[in-house]
Amino acid sequence: MKNTKKIALAGVLTALCFVFLYVGSLFQTMDLSAAAIGSIVILIAFIELGKKWAFYIYVSSAILSILLLPYKSPAAVFALFAGFYPILKESLNRIKPIFLSYVARIAVFNVALVLLVLVFKKLLAIEADYAKLEMAIFGLANITFLVYDFALERIAATYFTRLKPLIFGKR
């Protein structure tokens, strides 16, 4: 793909990612869903343009979201986890045996989750101790992450087999 086409596609994907995050900011119950949909845009960028361009799209979308969104939760989730995970996932998938690959994926998610909790505690100035609730949330979040990880794999496979030929033609 020529460089001008890459730049144009990167601009369109950045705008699309920002629009999804903006919708998640407007409807605050959709903040996690918007970040997950934004990560699908990054996944498509990774497939079509490669790691470097996908990273540029992630960074530009995250910066735009942090600066412009009225409600920052989708921007925080996207910037601290959902945006970079599709780029990192390819490297994590190559770890053998598969058990260690899953351990690495869950470790990356848990580091991001701890960062998100710390950011939200600072932003919301929460002082109360909710240790039991936090442990339950971490457990449910890890289960949700495994579903998200599986869904990303299925979405990538569907994109390769069905959507890419429709959108870009057979190459």
Describe the function of each predicted region.
Residues 7-12, 33, 55-59, 75-76, ...:
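Hydrophobic alpha-helical transmembrane segments
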Residues 22-31, 62-91:
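Interfacial aromatic-anchored transmembrane helix boundaries in multi-pass membrane proteins
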Residues 45-56, 93-99:
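Membrane-helix interface "capping/anchor" motifs
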Residues 3, 134-171:
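Alpha-helical transmembrane segments and their cytosolic interface
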Residues 1-47, 52-53:
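Hydrophobic transmembrane alpha-helices
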Residues 120-133:
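Membrane-interface helix termini and inter-helical loops of multi-pass transporters
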Residues 71, 106-122, 142-150:
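Mid-bilayer segments of alpha-helical transmembrane spans in multi-pass integral membrane proteins
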Residues 78-114, 118:
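Short helix-perturbing small/polar motifs within transmembrane alpha-helices
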